[in-house]
Curated annotation (Swiss-Prot):
HEAT repeat start and end residues: 308-345, 347-385, 401-446, 452-489
The keyword Kinase is assigned to this record: no
Name this polypeptide is given: Tubulin-folding cofactor D
Protein species of origin: Schizosaccharomyces pombe (strain 972 / ATCC 24843)
GO cellular component: cell division site; cytosol; microtubule; microtubule cytoskeleton; mitotic spindle; nucleus; tubulin folding cofactor complex
Lineage of producing organism: Eukaryota, Fungi, Dikarya, Ascomycota, Taphrinomycotina
Alphabetized UniProt keyword annotations: Chaperone, Cytoplasm, Cytoskeleton, Glycoprotein, Microtubule, Repeat
Gene name linked to the record: alp1
Subcellular location, record wording: Cytoplasm, Cytoskeleton
Single Gene Ontology BP annotation: tubulin complex assembly
Primary localization: cytoplasm
Glycosylation site positions: N122, N126, N373, N721, N883, N1083
Described function: Has a function in the folding of beta-tubulin. Microtubule-associated protein that is essential to direct polarized cell growth and to position the nucleus and septum to the center of the cell during mitosis.
Subunit and interaction comment: Interacts with alp21.
InterPro entries, sorted: ARM-like, ARM-type_fold, TBCD, Tubulin_specific_chaperoneD_C
Amino acid sequence: MEEEESLEGIISIDESLITSRLSQILDDVLDDRSSSHSVEKLKDVAVKYLQFCQFQPTLLDKLLSKYVPNLASYLLKVKNIGKCNSITVILYQFCKIRGYKAVRVLFPVGVQYIKELYTLLNESSNNTWHFHYIVLLWLSQALNTPFPLNSLDDSLDVKKTIYTIAIKYLENSGIDKEASCLVLSRLFSRDDGLDLLLGFLHHCESSWFKRSIFYKIGCLFSLSSFLKICPRNDCLQTVDVAFQFLNVAREDLVGQENSALRKLLCKCYTRLGIVLLPVNSSPNWKYSISNPDSFFQLPDDSNEEVHIYLEVIVDFLLSSVSDIDSFVRWSAAKGLAKIISRLPWNLAEQVIDAIIELMTENMFLNPIENTVNISITSPLVWHGAILFFAKLAGAGLIKYSKCLHILPLIEVGLSYEVRYGTRVTGQSIRDASCYFVWSFYHCYSKSAIEGLQTNLILCLLQTVLFDNEINVRRAATAALFEVIGRHASIPDGLSLISHINYVSVTDISNCYGDLCMKVAHFPQFRSCVFQRLFTNLQHWDVKVQQLSAFSLRQLSIKYPKELSIYLPPILDYLSVGNADFIFGYTIGLASIIGGFLSISFPFDINRIHDLLSHKNLLSLKKFSRQQQTKIILGILKGIQQIFANDIRVDRAFFSEAFSVIIAAIDLQEETIIKDISDAYSVLVKFDDMEETLEVLLDYIRKCSTSKEARIVYIILQNLPNISFRYQKKICKLLLDIYPQLHSIDYQAPVANALQNIIPFTYEKTESIEEFVKELLQVCSNYLTDTRGDVGSWIRKPAMKAISSLLVKDSSGKKLSEDIVWCCISYIIRQTFDKIDSLRGLAYQALEQIRVHYLIRRCEALTNIINRIRNNPNMDGEVLNELNISLLEIPNLRLQAFYGITVFTADGFGSDLAVKCFEFYLSYVYQLEDSFKKSNSRYGKRDLLQLYIDILSSEDEIARFYFPIMKSFTSLLAYGCFTDFQNVKGMSKAIFIVQRRALTCKSPGGLSAILELYRTLFLSKNELLRHHALKYTANLLLNPIEKVRYQAADTLLYAKSIGLLTFLPNELNQKLLTLDWFVPVSQNATFVKQLRNIIQKQIDKLIADR
């Protein structure tokens, strides 16, 4: 723990302290006095420190040069396996973070180490992979020693020994195989090791198809490493054998899904091809920045012949350029570029032409629109080919004549996107195209490519602004920086990149918004921005279409004249048979027009009548329901854009817009309900005659099901606050319809509509009370289902409506006092709701209605509301105290009682419910038996009578009945009503409870009833005790096993406290031994006998009285 705390402190102070702490730890590791256990602990701490160097691996450079040789030397002399493992783990972490190439060269090299290392591998009992990895890595470096291996030990063939040791690791799947491949490649590259290579290749070729995939990867990795480090003249001696082996491996690729094999095969073929082509085999035809003319000059054809194997190698790499795995394509592209760099120009040109031909296969040009169709091209080919071109550009291997063919393809690649069903490809191609642009401008001078760059820069800028992928936008930004930084000829380039950076392109909304406006400020870039936005209106992604429409609206406000030119072509596109196009161009056109109207730009609104001519579009049978929905959605969004402005439209145009809304309602699509509502909310402001409302009301009346009318309810719920003549009619219709709805999903929109309409209706009519009474009936919804308390979907808007009414009534005074107190009582009831948001809303409502004249007359309620206002943090104890105080207000007492008892029930549950019950219990304790002896308006007898009245009610809904019963049971158990009991009233109450028990199917409700009976066993009244015994016995025949078991347990409790002494011994014995989990019929006789005996006792008690 102390190490972890100090580590955290070091990270927060200075990174340099990490290296100093690591240095101390490594010194302790190298100390001979350190035990194996302490070294292992130090290793764990060192690894933790090393993890923090992963993002800055160069921090380790000073440590590596000092400690790698020391740790390696210490590894040879240490005998303890634990210490050995700790050292190799630290060395492996160095390799992992800094790279094995940087660590390997630091191992001590000498002829004496070779024998020690292979002996250590042979004789050591250490089987950990990191030990073998480090020793093999060191051995691969030690083999650089320029001495014949046979001179090390006359008794052994050292080469064979090392070869045998290394070859056995090729079957492993771990990282130690990689180190063994490095050993083999170093061994083969020695002057005295070529014979081993030939034997290795022959052996691999003969047994290739029998070997595991790990062995094959090891063989190819060994060969590729050998071809990389071995001198060319030595490699030429093995070309035939290596080529034959690679052909065998290539044949094995058929049906092979392992991408690592294909990548290694690309590497091997590439390095073999480089061996076959000397550096000076071709004239110097590459571009040189010191000779700009070299970009345009073509060298004379060369008659120089190349090796016959090269054709096979190039053919394989060309096929690998379109491999299914990206890193295989990348390896093939790099390999081809390296080979081309050594080919004569006439041969290099053939390879480049072959790649261009692969790209243009299945690509078609539309001469009318001057666009390219790439829908059936291969994205794999395009990605590999562009990576190949990028490597050529970075090396200066592209001539002017080829640029004329390649750059148009790169321009297409910058916006390449093809959709296959639900899958979209093209992200990697656009990213590779940005890499090409970066490489091209990084290598070539301004004077060389100045005439080629115009379209390329515009396409790049479009990618920066409008690409969907953040990594592509950032890659395009990097390329743009390279273009402008190296080629200052671009107009306003520096001003442009002052707005564009890696952070600003992170948010795509910012790209379409702020950045788009800033780029469009430069006239030379404005046209390309417009064109790409209009192209994006055809995009399949709705989000892209909407962002483009938003951007066009912003631009239409600032550049109305330039954008007005594009309107006629857009209107033509509305007649095409593509739903995506129609949707995009509809919202785009509406956004532009909305921008024009917002700045009063002169525009004839009737020119876009076709925008609302949905009937002609939707009548076409080729549109599916989903496509029709999308077209309607586009028109709805267009209505929102156009009618959101203060414009004058003729009646025909308005009627056409309203017919779109009716058509959208008829579709009955849930996904566009909000858009229908929003469109009508802006359209209704132009309905001076208010005819549309009458149409909607008729639509509701004609609907055969509530599902069909649900959309209209939602429309009415979102109506704006404007003058309507139909408010009273709407209100009446909704209140009449509500009782007929049997699903909360349809009731909730009606309640929300009433929330908005009833307060407006208050201002327009004098007879508002009938609506308020019906609203109070609507709002008492406590329905629950699998989604939880869905009744809150009704109570919340109803409470908002009631609070708005009371605020208006504070000055209007249209409501009677009884109705007002009912409304206040409803809000009071919600202050005890179990949903936190509803309770908070109820407290807010109380604060809003405090201005009502009736509340101002009630000093107690006013004080409560003021204390709530002074308690903005809603402190639990204060609120509970205030809630209990509501019981003292006569007009609110019943609702407060319901709220408290239902919320707290038996005093268990949430912390808030427990606290509230404690306050309620203390309130009951302080009540006297008679209110005349108490500070309260009410006494315990009054409270007891209230409980009895509710428990005696057969109409009370179960949601309230059982929590109130639990509350009553808890108060009885706490002895609140011990000194007096209304026997007659209690007897009636528990009789009604018993009747409920006979019809109750809820185990929770029956359990609450049995708890009440158990509590009554402690009553001082003997008659009540026997009634409770009888009713408990009745539940012994309940069909629910759990209830029967609890009833039997309750009777056993009665027996334990001496209430069943009158039972015969036989029945007492049966009560103890009967199985209550068997079918009911088996115990029916016993239960009947038990009930009869208890009834006789009851009759006797009544007779005695």
